[in-house]
């Protein structure tokens, strides 16, 4: 593994999205980035910040502007690559822990049998993590965030997934199983 932490970018760029009713959604995403960057600096952890937009596009520039509001004084780098190379999956696979808010990439990470941390600092009941316990944090406290992240990083994958006390393949099937299920359904129609 190349990285300790993969932070999933979740910029609040579209005022017409499903999270419009959550007034602190954007600030929650910003706070997650602040906490993650601070922790990585303090603990000398290797971070990859995975963007959802392509570099030098309008949305890519807006994504950087969004995080500049929260991380401006800190130097930060968002990896913005063409989706055709599946950069988010690559970075998740190369990381010990994936951190985010509501991104489907967190479920994808579970499907890849990778550790995740859902950060729901918004307090909104509209946002529900499919996981709880070690895999979720709700209190917007840097001290609690740091403690939880370091705890997860100290656990083996087996101990982490055993502590979830759920069948994580019910949250997201491994990619090979997803392909098999789709392939089997297509064959039924042939």
List PLM regions with ranges.
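C-terminal alpha-helical cap of glycosyltransferases
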Residues: 172-190
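Hydrophobic/aromatic beta-strand patches that form the interior of the parallel beta-sheet core
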Residues: 6, 48, 97-99, 117-119, ...
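Catalytic binding pocket for nucleotide-activated donors in carbohydrate/polymer assembly enzymes
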Residues: 66-68, 72-73, 104-173
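Alpha-helical elements of Rossmann-like donor-binding domains used by nucleotide-donor carbohydrate transfer enzymes
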Residues: 34, 144, 148, 181-185
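Conserved catalytic-core segment of nucleotide-activated headgroup transferases in glycan assembly
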Residues: 1-67
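Donor nucleotide-activated moiety binding/catalytic core segment of transferases
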Residues: 52-112
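Short, surface-exposed amphipathic charged segments that create phosphate/polyanion-binding patches used
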Residues: 1-6, 88-97, 152-156
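Residues at the C-termini of beta-strands that transition into short coil/loop
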Residues: 9, 51, 82, 120, ...
């Amino acid at each position: 593994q190349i990285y300790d932490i993969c932070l999933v970018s979740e910029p609040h760029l579209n005022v017409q999205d499903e999270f419009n009713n959550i007034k602190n959604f954007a600030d929650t995403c910003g706070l997650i980035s602040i906490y993650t960057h601070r922790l990585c600096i303090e603990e000398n952890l290797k971070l990859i910040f995975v963007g959802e937009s392509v570099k030098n596009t309008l949305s890519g520039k807006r994504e950087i502007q969004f995080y500049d509001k929260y991380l401006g004084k800190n130097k930060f780098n968002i990896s913005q690559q063409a989706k055709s190379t599946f950069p988010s999956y690559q970075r998740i696979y190369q990381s010990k822990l994936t951190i985010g808010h509501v991104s489907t990439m967190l479920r994808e990470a579970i499907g890849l049998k990778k550790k995740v941390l859902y950060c729901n600092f918004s307090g909104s009941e509209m946002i529900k993590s499919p996981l709880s316990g070690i895999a979720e944090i709700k209190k917007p406290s840097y001290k609690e965030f740091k403690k939880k992240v370091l705890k997860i990083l100290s656990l083996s994958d087996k101990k982490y997934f055993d502590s979830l006390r759920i069948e994580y393949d019910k949250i997201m099937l491994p990619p090979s199983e997803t392909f098999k299920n789709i392939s089997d359904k297509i064959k039924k129609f042939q």
